[in-house]
Every structure is written in C-alpha cells, then in structure tokens.
Amino acid sequence: MGTKGKVIKCKAAIAWEAGKPLSIEEVEVAPPKAHEVRVQINAAGLCRSDTHVINPKFEGAFLPVILGHEGAGIVESVGPGVTNVKPGDKVIPLYIPHCKKCKFCLSPLTNFCEKFCKGKNPLIEQELMEDKTSRFTCKGKSIYHFFGISAFSQYTVVKDVNLAKIDDDANLERVCLIGCGFSTGYGAAINTAKVTPGSTCAVFGLGGVGLSAIMGCKTAGASRIIAIDINSDKFAKAKALGATDCLNPRELNKPVQDVIVEMTNGGVDFAIDCAGGSEVMKATVDCATVGWGSCTFVGVNLADKGLTISPIELILGRTLKGTNFGGWDAETVPKLVSDYKNGKFDLDALVTHTLPFDKINEALNLLDQGKSIRTVLIF
C-alpha cells in the first residue's frame, strides 16, 4: 500500500496568527499535480526570514501558513511531466525557481527566475501553487504555502523547478542549511562581492548568514576579515571560521565604520551587510574604501526605511550590490553539496542546536534570544 496518488496525513507547524507560537497540527497533504513533487522533509533549519512573516510588524503576510524554507528531504512521489527527479531521490527545495527558459534563467548575470519576485517582497510570493490553490488542508481550512517550500511539515509539495537533486549519500541534517542560510552568506562573498585574494573585508551580522559570509571571504583568500556584531558571544565562532578581528559597536567610543577605516588605512575592499537596517547599511558603505570599495547587501530588517545615500559616496568609486541566495541556483547547488562532502567548508560549525520537530517553538525562542546560530529540526 503506497502513498502515491493519495492524500497524506502528517504533522506540520502552522502559523495561525501573527505574534503567536506555531501550532503542531495534523494536516492533509494532497498528491502532486502536473510539474509538482511531493517531498518527505527529513531536516529543516530555522531562518530569521521565517520569523519575519509572523512578526506583527510585517505587512502583507498570508495566514494561516506553514513556514520553513531551509530544508532537505526525499522525493515521495511526482506529478505528471516531472523529469528532473524521481521517487527516492534526495533533494533540497529552493525558494528561487529555475525554469531554464526565461530571460533571467538564460542570463549568466543572475540566479533569478521570472517565476520569482514578481512583486516587491519575495517573502509573500509563491504562497500558492501554479493553479492558485494550496496542497495543504487543516481542519477543513486551506493553508498557505511559504516561499514555495513550507519545510515545517513532514511532507510538502513543491514545483519541480524549485528542486535541486543532490547526491544519494548527502547528510540531510547538514545540507539542509544549503537551502538558504549558508548559501546566501557564502555566495554573497564568493559570487556577488567576488572577494579577491589578499583583500580586506568587513562582515556585519554574525548569524548563520554572516558566519557563512566569513567562510566565503576566507575561501576566497581575504587577508583580513573584520566581523561586527552587537553580541560578543558570537566572536569566538567568527574567529574559528576565519575572522581576524571582531568589533562590538556598543563597546566602541566612536562609530564602528570610523574604527574600521582607521584599522584598514582608509577602509576595506569589500563590506558585506548580513544584518540589515539603516544604521548597518550606512556603516557598510562608510567603511568601504573610496576608489573601489564594494558594498554587498544581504540582510533585511523589518519595518526599516533603508539607506539614504549621497551621490558623493558613489562617485568616489564605491559600488553597491544586492544579492539573494548568494547567486546559486538549482544547477549549482549540487556542486555545493559535493564541496561540503569534500571538506571545502564546515556546515557543522553553524549548527548550535539539534531538536525534534515538535520543539520548534523552543527553537524560535533560542533564535529570538540570540542563543542559537542555526537550529536543525529533525522529523
């Protein structure tokens, strides 16, 4: 008695209301339709973007919703027309689709797809499948998808263009982090900023994304990597991953960007903002050297009005770049998994807690209290 073509009943964490704990519920997961895949999630990381959507300050959220966008699992069944994966394959769901047909997918300049970011905020897109319906039901009510993934469910349904097939021997409890946090930070340094050997770098924010950016800077051969965070407890981990200096803005007697400029004789070659917020964005620009300083922005801060910048700061030679998912896509993610298996980088260092899925609210509390970098939930 297989499950193919049948509704599956399983456990999922549902956000019914903003500002309230998630609720573990039994949900019904419909079979995949054309060009859809039903995936059994084995492990999922908890990312700050998941908490943004249930913050009362967030505008436009679709509720109730099953969150989670950093997961890994095994294909349970496929719908008609699916050719890129088959039942039994290990996969990482990706919140950026890769249709391979649109002008974005065909361009070497971006990892975007026309199916992604059609509006102003990707966090509230892909909330339904292509036919504008959900595959989740709970207590007779339709439940929204999140980012096209909804990894906080034992089973989920995603579009075939939102999947990367990975090696059969991949450790799902670690490579799930490649679904967002690690790839976003590491790629911001490697792919977007294009950090060069011998360069100086500043990384703002030492969560999972920021620490991954430090790993990227180190891999690229940076000679000096300055890590900045208001939580000094994160400095030991940052140094273990490659940071040469650590600064806490709250412990300085002048703006952190001024300190960085003094430390580096005029500013860093590459500045990467993994925290977000107008103050951090301004510091990112100000700490970059004139002439060629590169500023890459990754972090998002809720309800922040963003950066106000003078043309003078730009005509002095600085460049500003934005990045999403570190420039990776469904074709390049499998290479990241292979690089992890071959020891090119250490995903283990990012995992501070491993908890059973039903402890998800405990994991959220650890994140809010700044006590975790990445918590991996095991299903």
Swiss-Prot record:
CC terms in the record's Gene Ontology section: cytosol
Catalytic activity: a primary alcohol + NAD(+) = an aldehyde + NADH + H(+); a secondary alcohol + NAD(+) = a ketone + NADH + H(+)
Record-listed NAD(+) binding positions: G205, L206, G207, G208, V209, G210, D229, K234, V298, G299, V300, R374
Gene Ontology molecular function terms on file: alcohol dehydrogenase (NAD+) activity; S-(hydroxymethyl)glutathione dehydrogenase [NAD(P)+] activity; zinc ion binding
Entry note: cofactor: Binds 2 Zn(2+) ions per subunit.
Location relative to the cell: Cytoplasm
Organism domain of life: Eukaryota
Cofactor(s) this protein cannot do without: Zn(2+)
Record-linked Gene3D superfamilies: Medium-chain alcohol dehydrogenases, catalytic domain, NAD(P)-binding Rossmann-like Domain
Gene Ontology biological process terms from the UniProt entry: formaldehyde catabolic process
UniProt cross-references to Pfam families, sorted A to Z: ADH_N, ADH_zinc_N
UniProt keyword terms in alphabetical order: Cytoplasm, Metal-binding, NAD, Oxidoreductase, Zinc
Record-listed Zn(2+) 2 binding positions: C99, C102, C105, C113
Binding site for Zn(2+) 1: C47, H69, C176
EC nos: 1.1.1.1
Subunit structure: Homodimer.
Record PANTHER family: ALCOHOL DEHYDROGENASE (PTHR43880), ALL-TRANS-RETINOL DEHYDROGENASE [NAD(+)] ADH4 (PTHR43880:SF14)
Homology family: Belongs to the zinc-containing alcohol dehydrogenase family. Class-II subfamily.
Protein name: Alcohol dehydrogenase class-2 isozyme 1
Lineage of the organism: Eukaryota, Metazoa, Chordata, Craniata, Vertebrata
